[in-house]
Amino acid sequence: MAVSLWQQCIGRLQDELPAQQFSMWIRPLQAEMDGDTLVLYAPNRFVLDWVREKYINIINQFFTEQMGSDAPKLRFDIGSRPSAKKFEPAPVATVRAPNTQTKATVGTYFNTQAEPIANANHRSNINPTYQFDNFVEGKSNQLGKAAALQVAENPGGAYNPLFLYGGTGLGKTHLLHAVGNGIIKNNPNAKVVYMHSERFVQDMVKALQNNAIEEFKRYYRSVDALFIDDIQFFANKDRSQEEFFHTFNALLEGNHQIILTSDRYPKEIDGVEDRLKSRFGWGLTVAIEPPELETRVAILMRKAQESGINLPDEVAFFIAKRLRSNVRELEGALNRVIANANFTGRPITIDFVREALRDLLALQEKLVTIDNIQKTVAEYYKIKMADMLSKRRSRSVARPRQVAMALSKELTNQSLPEIGDAFGGRDHTTVLHACRKIAQLREESHDIKEDYANLIRTLSS
């Protein structure tokens, strides 16, 4: 009875919570009765603590509404309910003896004649240097890291497939490798394959050329976990999409983990079949956004520490405030500073950094101005540039104006009064309100979150 009530509660939560929150925190929970107590199993401590803090009152309220004083007690535990199916390595397949007349090697990942596919090394290409421990977490990537951690602990479970999307250089590939390392640590025999989508296409083409398509299928469908980076490169490659469609289905039916990354939201990927885009969203879709200031500073400090360099706090903030687009750009700039310091023997100060990065900083200041932000936002929302400066308060105009103010605060070094002046002489408190409002809406509204991320990418590219 109580387990059935939990299913009703799930239905209520699904209606009330944003889809991403529901998928992230509620869907992984498993329920089982223990006497008069309903035990909710969370996959790890992170989820358990989050649900206790954020959702326990909603759950208890629902139970009380439905059963009054007969409502079951609640207890939380970590793990799976005893009846839950656990992750197992993929079964070893058998294949025919190789055709000795076939001489060509197909791709990098399997050979048409060297050895039976089942016994071949599934070359994972998992980079051991990419771990969760050295992934700098911030608000922009917190959900992505949490989801990746859960997949590493319970591959083939609730988040399957896991789809990570965001601009270049934001850490999506790092998370893929971290998951792979986590799975292999827990199960050294697991067959984990990481690749760029173009490698999948190249392997399939070579398999077709060498009449080895069956070996290709057996190889990819016998892995325990398949991670494909930059899935958007499947666009307009119909045969590759067809083969991946069947590979995807086979792996999912066997409860084997799939993680995909892209530079855009699944439904926005042009040239990919709708049936594939639909499947990309079956599990959990998480945005990886450009890092906020505090995370950018932490990334610089971590990188400097790894390089054995003492980076002053004020220098880290100086760089982080001016380079905002992605982690790769930050690390490249720091490497340049370190190289210059080693070459000249000069201490790393703000003046030294300003000189070492003068061309890069000049380019950034030229590209990101309040005027440029206003024009970009106006074009994005299809409003007139004059509306940015007007007193109109209709939502169709006011919301884009607030977005532009928030972007100006984040992407330029202008003060709140200066931003207000640029928006028709508004008071600095109006700008502050706009920034807070957009920050709130990015948490609550998927559309605003997407719009903001798209504009950041456009302005930072």
From Swiss-Prot:
<dbReference type="GO" id="GO:0016887">
    <property type="term" value="F:ATP hydrolysis activity"/>
</dbReference>
<dbReference type="InterPro" id="IPR001957">
    <property type="entry name" value="Chromosome_initiator_DnaA"/>
</dbReference>
<dbReference type="InterPro" id="IPR013159">
    <property type="entry name" value="DnaA_C"/>
</dbReference>
<dbReference type="GO" id="GO:0006275">
    <property type="term" value="P:regulation of DNA replication"/>
</dbReference>
<dbReference type="GO" id="GO:0003688">
    <property type="term" value="F:DNA replication origin binding"/>
</dbReference>
<dbReference type="InterPro" id="IPR020591">
    <property type="entry name" value="Chromosome_initiator_DnaA-like"/>
</dbReference>
<feature type="region of interest" description="Domain II">
    <location>
        <begin position="84"/>
        <end position="124"/>
    </location>
</feature>
<dbReference type="InterPro" id="IPR010921">
    <property type="entry name" value="Trp_repressor/repl_initiator"/>
</dbReference>
<dbReference type="GO" id="GO:0005886">
    <property type="term" value="C:plasma membrane"/>
</dbReference>
<keyword id="KW-0547">Nucleotide-binding</keyword>
<dbReference type="Pfam" id="PF00308">
    <property type="entry name" value="Bac_DnaA"/>
</dbReference>
<dbReference type="InterPro" id="IPR003593">
    <property type="entry name" value="AAA+_ATPase"/>
</dbReference>
<protein>
    <recommendedName>
        <fullName>Chromosomal replication initiator protein DnaA</fullName>
    </recommendedName>
</protein>
<feature type="region of interest" description="Domain IV, binds dsDNA">
    <location>
        <begin position="342"/>
        <end position="461"/>
    </location>
</feature>
<feature type="binding site">
    <location>
        <position position="171"/>
    </location>
    <ligand>
        <name>ATP</name>
    </ligand>
</feature>
<keyword id="KW-0446">Lipid-binding</keyword>
<comment type="function">
    <text>Plays an essential role in the initiation and regulation of chromosomal replication. ATP-DnaA binds to the origin of replication (oriC) to initiate formation of the DNA replication initiation complex once per cell cycle. Binds the DnaA box (a 9 base pair repeat at the origin) and separates the double-stranded (ds)DNA. Forms a right-handed helical filament on oriC DNA; dsDNA binds to the exterior of the filament while single-stranded (ss)DNA is stabiized in the filament's interior.</text>
</comment>
<dbReference type="Pfam" id="PF08299">
    <property type="entry name" value="Bac_DnaA_C"/>
</dbReference>
<dbReference type="InterPro" id="IPR024633">
    <property type="entry name" value="DnaA_N_dom"/>
</dbReference>
<comment type="similarity">
    <text>Belongs to the DnaA family.</text>
</comment>
<comment type="subunit">
    <text>Oligomerizes as a right-handed, spiral filament on DNA at oriC.</text>
</comment>
<feature type="region of interest" description="Domain I, interacts with DnaA modulators">
    <location>
        <begin position="1"/>
        <end position="84"/>
    </location>
</feature>
<keyword id="KW-0963">Cytoplasm</keyword>
<dbReference type="GO" id="GO:0006270">
    <property type="term" value="P:DNA replication initiation"/>
</dbReference>
<keyword id="KW-0238">DNA-binding</keyword>
<dbReference type="Pfam" id="PF22688">
    <property type="entry name" value="Hda_lid"/>
</dbReference>
<dbReference type="GO" id="GO:0005524">
    <property type="term" value="F:ATP binding"/>
</dbReference>
<keyword id="KW-0067">ATP-binding</keyword>
<keyword id="KW-0235">DNA replication</keyword>
<dbReference type="InterPro" id="IPR038454">
    <property type="entry name" value="DnaA_N_sf"/>
</dbReference>
<feature type="region of interest" description="Domain III, AAA+ region">
    <location>
        <begin position="125"/>
        <end position="341"/>
    </location>
</feature>
<dbReference type="InterPro" id="IPR027417">
    <property type="entry name" value="P-loop_NTPase"/>
</dbReference>
<dbReference type="GO" id="GO:0008289">
    <property type="term" value="F:lipid binding"/>
</dbReference>
<dbReference type="InterPro" id="IPR055199">
    <property type="entry name" value="Hda_lid"/>
</dbReference>
<dbReference type="GO" id="GO:0005737">
    <property type="term" value="C:cytoplasm"/>
</dbReference>
<dbReference type="InterPro" id="IPR018312">
    <property type="entry name" value="Chromosome_initiator_DnaA_CS"/>
</dbReference>
<dbReference type="InterPro" id="IPR013317">
    <property type="entry name" value="DnaA_dom"/>
</dbReference>
<feature type="binding site">
    <location>
        <position position="173"/>
    </location>
    <ligand>
        <name>ATP</name>
    </ligand>
</feature>
<dbReference type="Pfam" id="PF11638">
    <property type="entry name" value="DnaA_N"/>
</dbReference>
<feature type="binding site">
    <location>
        <position position="172"/>
    </location>
    <ligand>
        <name>ATP</name>
    </ligand>
</feature>
<feature type="binding site">
    <location>
        <position position="169"/>
    </location>
    <ligand>
        <name>ATP</name>
    </ligand>
</feature>
